């Protein structure tokens, strides 16, 4: 314990330049870098914000069928060929429902325009 107290006293007596030189010498001796954890933490904090700003995939959600329900049902069947007439009708009548998931921004915008032209209300999430 006495050795540790002596080390603390010796380190406290160093000037800023001497402390910086000591840090460099320890980095070389131990093969580490004191700056790496700081850089990783800064990059890690910025990544989620960038991901939130640049969303590339969207879900097309039918929020309301509107007055032209038959046209909207036909469009749902066109967009999702796996759905039969009954499933498409149930989807439209059960709005809000997700019509397509993980669609590119351009495709999502195109689908939104088609649904709005058919009288439906659509959200991109």
UniProtKB/Swiss-Prot annotation:
GO terms for biological process: translation. InterPro entries: Ribosomal_bL12 (IPR000206), Ribosomal_bL12_C (IPR013823), Ribosomal_bL12_C/ClpS-like (IPR014719), Ribosomal_bL12_oligo (IPR008932), Ribosomal_bL12_oligo_N_sf (IPR036235). Gene3D superfamilies: 3.30.1390.10, Single helix bin (1.20.5.710). GO terms for molecular function: mRNA binding; structural constituent of ribosome. Signal peptide: none annotated. It comes from the Bacteria. Keywords: Ribonucleoprotein, Ribosomal protein. Coiled coil: none annotated. Pfam families: Ribosomal_L12, Ribosomal_L12_N. One of its GO terms (cellular component) is ribonucleoprotein complex. Belongs to the bacterial ribosomal protein bL12 family. Homodimer. Part of the ribosomal stalk of the 50S ribosomal subunit. Forms a multimeric L10(L12)X complex, where L10 forms an elongated spine to which 2 to 4 L12 dimers bind in a sequential fashion. Binds GTP-bound translation factors. Forms part of the ribosomal stalk which helps the ribosome interact with GTP-bound translation factors. Is thus essential for accurate translation. HAMAP family: Ribosomal_bL12. This is Large ribosomal subunit protein bL12. The gene is rplL.
């Amino acid at each position: 314990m006495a050795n540790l107290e002596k080390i603390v006293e010796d380190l406290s007596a160093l000037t800023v330049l001497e402390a910086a030189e000591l840090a460099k010498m320890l980095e070389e001796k131990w093969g580490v870098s004191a700056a790496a954890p700081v850089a990783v933490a800064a990059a890690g904090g910025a990544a989620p914000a960038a991901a939130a700003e640049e969303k590339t995939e969207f879900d097309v959600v039918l929020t309301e069928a509107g007055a032209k329900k038959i046209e909207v049902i036909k469009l749902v069947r066109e967009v999702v060929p796996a759905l039969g007439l009954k499933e498409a009708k149930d989807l439209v009548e059960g709005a809000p429902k997700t019509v397509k998931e993980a669609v590119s921004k351009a495709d999502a915008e195109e689908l939104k325009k088609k649904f709005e032209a058919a009288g439906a209300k659509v959200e991109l999430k």
